[in-house]
Amino acid sequence: MNKIKSLFAWLWQKFRAFCTWYKGLYQGRAWYTKTLVALASCIVAFILYLGAVDINFLWLFGKSPGYFSGILDPQTSEASEIYSADGKLIGKYFNENRTPVEYDEVTPDFFKALVDTEDERFYKHIGIDPIGVFAAAKDALLHHNGRGASTITQQLAKNMFRVRSQYSTGLLGKIPVLRLLIIKSKEWIIAVKLETVFSKKEIITMYANTVDFGSNSYGIKTAAKTYFNTTPKELTTGQAAVLVGMLKATTYYNPRTNPENSFARRNTVLYNMVTHGDLSKDRYNELKDEPIKLDFKVEENYDGQAKYFREAVANYLKDWCKDEGYDLYTSGLKIYTTIDTRMQKYAEDAARKQMKQVQQNFNNHWSIRRTQAGKGNWMGQDPWQDENHNVIPNFIQGIAERQPFYKALIARFPNNPDSVNYYYKEWVHPVKVFDYDKGSITMNMTSEDSIKYMTTFMHCAFVAMEPQTGAVKAWVGDIDFDHWKYDKVTAERQPGSTFKLFVYTEAMNQGLTPCDKRRDEYISMEVYDKKKHEMTTWRPSNANGSFSGDSIPLKSAFAKSINSVAVRLGQEMGIKRIIETAKKMGINSPLDDTPSLALGSSDVNLLEMACAYSTIANNGKHHDPVLVTKIVDHDGKVVYEGPTDSEQVIPYKSAFLMQQLLQGGMKEPGGTSQSLWGYVGNYRDTEFGGKTGTTNNHSDAWFMCVSPKLVVGAWVGGEYRCLHFRTGALGQGSRTTLPVCGYFLQSVFGDPAFQQYHGKFDKPQDSDITRDMYICASYAPKPKVDTTKVDSTAFQEEIVLDDEGNPIIREVPAKKAESESANGTATTEEKKEKKKAKPTEQPVNFDDL
């Protein structure tokens, strides 16, 4: 403190000495000399003042941007753009929605209108317009009608460097009058600096890119898109005039909220163009009466395609941005991703189509009448039930108590539960809910009914991946992003029998082959129950509740998803070894070292499973999922490139044999994936394999499908695990989930643009692999005596395959066909068409766990 006092005392002493010297200059001088000295002194004082402001002398004026720290490299908040693999802009990340453009990307009429209206001497001044300043001062003094004197360059300085906020925080800036003087001084200084560094063309382009047009539209590119759904280059003269007119007051002259004001202001701008020779009088007369036609839509962060995928990309880049010093929402990055918009649309359409049917089945199954929601007893049964099919008490109440609105009711009525109960259970009010046909709809119902309505929707996830590159080509996180933002692709759920992939892969690693046999018989063992904290006897059963007692080839056991064989293999190979194999292939979720892991008891997510199945399709080479291929900064420099390396994590022989097992799901008699033929049976140039999965009580239904160049996976289930179907006929993976993949594959492989995904798995490349390892007789259960006419556990609609493993369509004798036709029954061709139309209705009699 003493040092500061001494400094000010020294400065005061020097100032007094200067005043004494300065006073001596006037003594004995002529009047004109005194006048010249006074003028020179004012000029010098003003220059010294500007210098003091620029260097923030004694912290009195606040910081200013230097040439190297700001002027040469101006930083503005720019939206980061995200692009698909097929070159489409699919969304943005932004705080201020701004995307810069080049001078040549804007119609010349916009710049003409801008200069004619905002700064007519723009091309003549050096950042400050003395004529404009004196004219504004004269109007203020004589007419008490002040007008703006800021040049375009000064406005750019204000927009780009925020001189009215962060650069006016000096000590003197706290004094209102001095604050205004300092702000204008800084604008002048920065404007002159900008004029010395940039050309007029660069300055006016930077201004067009930084100015605020209202409605969260920053810059000419975003404004043109928001108000007219066009590009800056395609703006008409009238549209350009509307946007320029808004700059005086974005709210008052907004064409959407104040159309009359905007209309008058537009014509003023057009007249200014006539005055300066940039628009003919005849053209003005044509334009002045034209109405303003808007195509208005405010762009939000969540607008665009692949919304769940874009959120996944944001999470993926969070750490990278932090490490590299970028802000995803302000740095103006261009992010190039692996997603394909055409495949994404196929995936979203497939999910919506199948889930609409699943939801209809679920509603009928539980007697839920959604159209009557909020009107009496619209739910016939409560579907939230435990593993013993008992209704879970207070289930909906528990969900409600976690919601903000319920917490607000408790805070408002802390000692009045009747009021809370009224507003929760009795007060009917408009609520926005989801509808498959209309998207978001408004219904009148109570808060309790709205929770029931939204909770009883079934959900899904889907992902498609290239096994050779890890590139994610399609990503569906749920049925509707606006209502459910939680991404089910990365949600962890029990995989059921789809986890058997790792059990059998480890078996192949340890020398077994698809033609080796294991007995399907009763098995029990002592295991530790984590819920009860005690040892208990675990008796895994097959889906049909019985055991054949036969020795079954592994290819048949895998295709039919026989649990007893999988559990036996798990014990034989070792659960720890199976966990190691799963981790190598792409599973990062924690896995429990317990015998039930062989049946998929530990939670994993769909992306991990797709990655692991891709390892098999890629001949044992693992590639991490790739979402982003490269990132380019706002200067055009590539600052990130996605990974391209893969690693051989399982032997080629094991991968090849697993490819045969997966294909067996479709080719083996009784294979649980056979209904996929109803979707891909026409594509004989491509081989497919699949694995279904369904957990206890049908809470989770899965399907994983592999082909040589494309792997897809899907999950279907309730938001809560207690919401599910009660029967395998409706709830198993082959019924609920397989069609999602089927519809997608049908669209992709039927599209000539994706011919590159067609193909067959490679022939064996290892001399150690012989045909007798994977080609052998399939298991056929022995006929049972004293049973029903059709034994659902033994009977499976037979699909006959040719030498290439493709289904053979049997011919119906002509006489028989004619007879059926005459009797009014469907012919073979009609049946085939019907089967194609509803492939989900093919009978599947194995309830795959």
Where would I find each of the regions flagged by the language model?
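Non-catalytic structural connector segments
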Residues: 145, 280-338, 342-418
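Short active-site loop at a secondary-structure junction
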Residues: 99-104, 451-460, 483-502, 515-518, ...
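Peptidoglycan glycan-strand catalytic modules in the bacterial/periplasmic cell-wall system
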Residues: 9, 76-285, 302, 308, ...
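Active-site SXXK
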Residues: 113-115, 273, 347, 469-470, ...
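Conserved catalytic neighborhood of penicillin-recognizing serine enzymes
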Residues: 142-168, 233, 297-308, 512-578, ...
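N-terminal type II signal-anchor transmembrane helix
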Residues: 1-83, 121, 141, 358
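Short, well-structured active-site flanking segments
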Residues: 123-133, 218-220, 280-285, 508-532, ...
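A penicillin-recognizing enzyme superfamily signal
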Residues: 337, 341-357, 391-466, 475-476, ...
